[in-house]
Amino acid sequence: MKGEKKSQGALRRTATEVKRYRTYKRVIPAVSGVIVALLVIVYVVSLLFGKYGSFTIKVKNYNDRNYAISLSETDAFLNPVTVLNSKANKDITNIDGNNLPENLNDINGEHNGKNYVAYTFYLKNTGTLEFSYDYKLLISKMTADIDSAVRVRLYFTPFYYTAESGVYDYVGKYVDYAKPKTGGNGAPEVDPVDRVMTNFSSAGVVTEGRIDGFKPGDISKVTVVIWIEGNDPDCTDDLLGGEFKLDMLFEIVGTDDD
């Protein structure tokens, strides 16, 4: 996949960078009903339960039961579902993306850090026939141009497990996505040191694509990481009050009968 990178070592930010280091907090409704002034919320409304979370993953139903996708927070699929919700709604501080740990793709389910949101899940062909599926990582809500400083890292291994051979792919490559550079005529953001971001696919879409040849028993692995990049020139007080919401959708679109 274009722009894929392997995990980098974790670093720490120094106090000398505090000038560009602003704190963003979520809205906290008080018991009295008074709403504290918000800075930034990074959340997604759960499509199933109406609760808040970091993001929601959903599989679109396919009428033929021979073609089925299930989701799980582990590759054992002991409790397969069609909707997953990361329930984190946490305070975060903008950070240098170089500070992210290198094991983000090694922990299942929700594994948020102090200054980032991370969620790992699996997608399995639980039907009886081979098919293709589309995936789309959507920005379903955004205000105050907060997306100009948000970064989304996607670890995506379409054939993490291949049922036919029984082989697992543990490499864990990733791509970092960002909105094109402000005033850059479509040029990508470049974060220190020389970390070139991949532009969002389009307005409202981080990335999308199609996976072909997904056979019964095959498993895909996905890790989504969200943070606010403190090195971005757009990471200013102008973002105060912004909201950001992600959904990831999967849909069966091609079968061996097509």
Question: At which residue positions do the language-model features occur?
Answer:
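Short, polar/proline-rich extracytoplasmic segments that appear immediately after membrane translocation
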Residues: M1-L100, G109-E110, F244, L249, ...
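C-terminal, structured domain-capping segment
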Residues: N99-Y133, L138-S140, V196-D258
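Residue-identity detector for threonine
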Residues: T14-T16, T23, T56, T74, ...
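Surface-exposed interaction patch
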Residues: R20-K25, P29, L38-I69, G109-N185
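Extracellular adhesion/glycan-binding regions together with long Ser/Thr-
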Residues: E17-S32, D96-D106, E110, A163-I219, ...
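Generic structural motif recognizing short loop/turn segments at the entrances and edges of beta-strands
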Residues: K5-A10, K51-F55, N63-Y67, T74-P80, ...
